[in-house]
Amino acid sequence: MNNRMYLQDLVQGRYGRKIAYTSVDKITADNVVKVIGECIGTFYYNKSVIRYLWNYYKGDQPILYRQKLTNEDITNRIVENHAYEIVQFKVGQTYGEPIQFISRKDDEAVNKAVDMLNDFMADANKQEKDIKAGEWQSATGTSFKAARPKANSDVPFLIVAPTPMNTFSIYNDSTEEPMLSVQELKDENGNWYKLAFSDTTSYKIQDGKLIESKLHTYGGIPIVEFPNNHERISDIELVIGMLDAINNMQSNRMDGVEQFVQYWIKFVNCQIDETEFEKMKKSHALTVKSNNGDNKSDVDIMTQELNQTQCQVAKDDIWDNTLSILAIPNKQGNTGGDTQGAVELRNGWDFSKTRAKLKDPIVKSAEKRLANVVLNILRVNDNDLKL
């Protein structure tokens, strides 16, 4: 589905991704089908919005389907993909450097084990998956990372970043702790099924029936959600109205330029046939003749140029507000004798760092869950780090 409509028309004011909750205290083979059935509607609702935001991030934006009622022969559709710029900045801010685990104990054995864990993560190319999941996280409001065993390898585990368009988590409505992670997948015959993980058991469900249930050794839910914030609001949807306005303004500006170039010629009190007019255009000269002294003939070019300066001022104002809302520094350089600290304060870098700190606890909490799963996989594969 193309992004022909605006996001507001899709979400009807319900911004942020819905969170799936259950009231059960323990997931079992007896209730897992019911729990997933009660939450699947939330997943499908989120899926449509996530698809819209992901395609918007990649450049499929409503301006591309713009229709005009007047002068429809001059219809420019310009996408200034600031959504991509925003997401890349946010991802670089959080995941630009590899995430490192550190020890809070002054213990040589613990410090050495933590260093080994960091080495395992580096060998598993975790940062690449961090960036991939970070793009989903910023663009759509949530993302997932998972750990799974890898046989016959120096690194006995894989880090993967499944798409939130086929993955969701279910939380307990009183403790807000994750109870279940679910993936909607296809088998080799093209049949849909759901693969779910609790902290102790994996479940396979097909056609509304539980067809497989078995214990796992992950030591926790192996698929971990990494929300962008507690409301799962994406960085794009916070300012999407202004991004659409910039696209519309730039498209109209190009229309104005094209209409100025493709001018109309007005003939007053004279008639020129098409053949004669084409000859005149080639020679860049016009000859007209007045019928009488009272009705003088004249030829004029009808143009009305758009005030580009005023348009740029309005556009800059919208973009400055966008950067302010997202706490992204502007690109103004140091034009005076300011110190580096003064430049950072003036251009918004300090504010940007403060905003980024609000996201750190969310990422740390999710990383701890993922690290526990990795440690259990290592333990099962005779690489117990004793952490």
Language-model features and meaning:
Residues 321, 325-385:
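C-terminal structural cap/anchor segments
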Residues 212-346:
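Extended, charged amphipathic alpha-helical segments
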Residues 109-113, 121, 125, 129, ...:
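Short amphipathic alpha-helical segments
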Residues 11-40, 47, 109, 150, ...:
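Charge-rich, acidic-biased intrinsically disordered regions
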Residues 131-232:
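Extended, regular secondary-structure scaffolds
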Residues 1-157:
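Extended, helix-rich architectural segments
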